[in-house]
Amino acid sequence: MDSQKSCIAVYPGTFDPLTNGHVSLVRRAAMIFGTVIVAVAGDSHKTPLFTLDERVAIAEQVFANDRRVLVEGFKGLLVNYVKSREANVILRGMRAVSDFEFEFQMALMNRKLDRTIETVFIMTDYKWLYISSTIVKEVAKHGGDIRGMVPEHVRERMLERFGPANGSGEGA
């Protein structure tokens, strides 16, 4: 068990925004691995709501009191970043069977690029199965209430971005 506790896991994602599903997965993983690095991706085919620096700052605020969790931004190939951090696990969350095909392909490619790095899948807590960053952004953009889907300070940042009638449920 001691070897598991010294294991460093990297949880990559755009986290735009960071949801309660992400937070739950990181906290559960931190009970398994010695350290979890929340690796906020700067290179993405997505157009982010928040800049890389903003997303890193948001995640740092959420995990500020958990010494087992580090937050860093990164750009480039994930496997190279994982190696640079001397980590040996890529952590991925699974919400539903629909996530599996893409995640399986990515895990196989990462394995091809570096056979010393393992991908570990953790099932999302059932409370968060329906939540994704994309859905949260759409709900907030159209004035829906996102309370309980994201940490409160994330909701506040989204209100700043979309306006007071959005993300609070007050304008819906």
UniProtKB/Swiss-Prot annotation:
ATP binds at T14, F15, H22, G93, M94, R95, E103, W128, L129, Y130, I131, S132, S133, T134. Keywords: ATP-binding, Coenzyme A biosynthesis, Cytoplasm, Magnesium, Nucleotide-binding, Nucleotidyltransferase, Transferase. The record marks H22 as: Transition state stabilizer. Gene3D superfamilies: HUPs (3.40.50.620). CDD domains: PPAT (cd02163). One of its GO terms (molecular function) is ATP binding. It is found in: Cytoplasm. Pfam families: CTP_transf_like. It comes from the Bacteria. GO terms for cellular component: cytoplasm. Its cofactor is Mg(2+). Belongs to the bacterial CoaD family. HAMAP family: PPAT_bact. This is Phosphopantetheine adenylyltransferase. It comes from Solidesulfovibrio magneticus (strain ATCC 700980 / DSM 13731 / RS-1) (Desulfovibrio magneticus).
